[in-house]
Amino acid sequence: MQHSERRVVFFDLDGTLHQQDMFGSFLRYLLRHLPLNLLLVVPMGPVILAGLAVSGRAARWPMSLLLWATTFGRREAVLKRLEAEFVGWFRHHVTAFPVVHARLTAYLTSTYADVWLITGSPQSLVEQVYRDTLWLPRVNLIASRTARRWGGWVLTLRCLGHEKVVQLEKKIGAPLRLYSGYSDSEQDNPLLGFCQHRWRVTPQGELQQLE
């Protein structure tokens, strides 16, 4: 079967395959363990909120600024240790959505689907949290990316909203033609718009088909 005949399917991660917001949980975890960084985060709060209000909730730079303020002045070894500790904590507390995982498994065991996991959470966190799952090596992952800049961590890519469309087009070309999409968030509507079948994941992990 040629690739053009295959069914392309995408899944969001946070609120879709599991209940929690991984990146938001990570930022809160860092601030609990690096409380002095609140001295930088709090004064920048109005700038960050204004940036999200003006540029949109999917904008990269306000959340990049928040991540930088949260990690500024900390050695890389300290941040990596906290990241590893967070991964262990998150793996213990995460709530999976079995109904959505069943759909994911069905597509992965089929012979006709190419599955893309497209998430706003940082790639390093996704790969560590789900490192021992059977499904992660079998999906095509597109995620936000982080790097060290100016004494802290920043987001070099925030894979949210229309950026998901841009990144998937870079991988498989435009115009997009997707068979099915699964997400809990209206921020994914730009990508869901290219799907023949669109599914909204409820806060309880159930599926509702969109028109």
Question: What kind of region is each of these model predictions?
Answer:
Residues 25-26, 64-66, 85:
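A general alpha-helix detector
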Residues 1-57:
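Active-site neighborhood of HAD-like aspartate-dependent phosphohydrolases
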Residues 2-6, 77-84, 88-211:
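C-terminal cap/substrate-recognition subdomain and adjoining C-terminal extension
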Residues 56-63, 137, 141:
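N-terminal short leaders/motifs
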Residues 33, 69-73, 89:
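Generic N-terminal helix/loop capping motif
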Residues 20-23, 60, 64, 75-76:
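Alpha-helix initiation and N-capping motif
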Residues 11-13, 26, 71, 137-138, ...:
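Broad hydrophobic/π-residue packing in well-ordered secondary structure
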Residues 50-53, 62-73:
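Helix-loop "lid/cap" segments that line or gate small-molecule binding pockets
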